């Protein structure tokens, strides 16, 4: 082996060991001068990628994304529908992701950067997609995908939540042709249900699909099992409660995902307008609180209020956002929502604020319903019984809002008798305090 080849081989091995390295780091490790190192790097231009610019320039080894190029454009769909060339992503050896954008030089190992969290296939829709992509050798559970697999599939997710698009977007719409009328809803629900194993709900998440209304506005639609089954009847009740909870919150001035319940002879549907989509193909970017906490908040996850108050203290959220999150938490506890995990609250972020890690506020409320009565595949149906309200939440301003919810649910003709009875009992408990 000639000396030049040996030097190049040694330099590649060193960069692989370090993951990414600056010129100064490589000079110190090899003992080579800057001109010599520059000549070696030029000779390795096909194997080494340059990251950043100026004094922040570093070098890494690109790693293809399941055959796709390691370097991919990151585009931001603006509110008016324009596609903005926002940044560049490079997947590197050692499970590293580098993102460069205006004012941003981000390097993560083993995970996506926080602002790309919406591009990860997850939840019910993610599991449905994973089953569709099984022929590509992917695990049926996207939670078990490698980072390379997550990024490779993100190249295909051009209708993912939020405004970021990885790779080249396809020409034309990727939305299904249905318009959200009752017959279309049944057909779409049957199509989704047919992809799942018998008795499965894809990991326990609420079954749902994407479509659009007659004006072309994107929708996300939850659907029940067949109504002539115990689980179908229970989910019908829960979707009615969810629609009412959002309606009550909206009456109190809280931004919510606008939703309504539609029912056919076979199923019930909660049809929600996607709040991250705008007329004319425009989009907005909302990031789950889980990803934001992981990036900026030290320590474990307590609850929405604690995390948002800390983000407000760091001046990443505007004043009052922490109190808003805490009020939603109290409302949820008072209506029996036992599923307020950190993926069920999101924060708005503008493209120019990503480098600073600042957020413009809480995104509209979604998935707010009495999940304590959710049917369970293992345990079956739990009885719809009144419960003891959370003492802290009971002493908060959310009590009045929750009382209105229970009173209206108790009088809701579409709810079952059992749900109306429990709602009436809960209203009395909240009145008594």
Residue positions per predicted region:
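Phosphate/dinucleotide-binding and metal-coordinating scaffold of catalytic cores
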Residues: 1-433
């Amino acid at each position: 082996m000639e000396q030049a080849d040996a030097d190049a081989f040694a330099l590649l091995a060193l960069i692989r060991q370090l993951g990414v390295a600056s010129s100064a780091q490589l000079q110190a490790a090899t003992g080579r001068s800057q001109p010599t190192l520059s000549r070696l790097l030029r000779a390795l231009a096909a194997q080494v990628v340059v990251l950043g610019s100026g004094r922040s320039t570093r070098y890494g080894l690109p790693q293809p994304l399941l055959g796709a190029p390691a370097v991919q454009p990151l585009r931001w769909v603006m509110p008016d529908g324009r596609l903005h060339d926002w940044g560049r992503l490079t997947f590197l050896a050692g499970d590293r992701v580098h993102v460069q954008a205006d004012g941003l030089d981000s390097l993560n190992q083993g995970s996506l950067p926080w602002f790309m969290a919406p591009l990860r296939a997850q939840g019910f829709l993610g599991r449905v997609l994973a089953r569709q992509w099984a022929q590509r050798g992917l695990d049926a559970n996207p939670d078990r995908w490698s980072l390379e697999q997550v990024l490779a599939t993100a190249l295909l997710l051009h209708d993912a939540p939020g405004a970021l698009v990885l790779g080249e977007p396809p020409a034309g719409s990727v939305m299904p042709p249905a318009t959200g009328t009752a017959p279309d809803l049944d057909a779409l629900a049957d199509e989704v249900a047919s992809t799942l194993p018998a008795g499965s709900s894809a990991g326990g998440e609420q079954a749902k699909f994407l479509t659009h209304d007659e004006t072309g506005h994107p929708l996300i639609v939850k659907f029940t099992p067949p109504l002539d089954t115990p689980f179908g009847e229970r989910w019908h009740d829960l979707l009615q409660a969810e629609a009412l909870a959002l309606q009550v919150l909206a009456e109190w001035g809280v931004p919510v995902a606008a939703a309504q319940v539609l029912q056919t002879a076979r199923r019930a549907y909660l049809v929600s307008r996607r709040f991250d989509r705008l007329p004319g193909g425009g989009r907005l970017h909302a990031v789950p609180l889980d990803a934001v906490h992981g990036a900026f908040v030290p320590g474990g996850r307590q609850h929405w209020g604690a995390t948002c108050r800390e983000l407000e203290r760091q001046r990443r959220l505007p004043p009052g956002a922490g109190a808003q999150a805490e009020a939603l938490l109290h409302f949820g506890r008072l209506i029996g929502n036992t599923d307020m995990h950190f993926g069920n609250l999101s924060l708005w972020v503008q493209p120019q604020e990503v480098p600073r890690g600042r957020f413009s506020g809480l995104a509209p409320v979604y998935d707010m319903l009495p999940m304590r009565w959710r049917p369970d595949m293992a345990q079956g149906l739990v009885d719809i019984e009144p419960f003891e309200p959370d003492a802290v939440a009971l002493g908060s301003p959310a009590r009045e809002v929750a009382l209105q919810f229970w009173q209206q649910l108790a009088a809701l003709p579409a709810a079952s008798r059992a749900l109306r009875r429990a709602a009436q009992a809960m209203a009395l408990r909240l009145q008594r305090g």
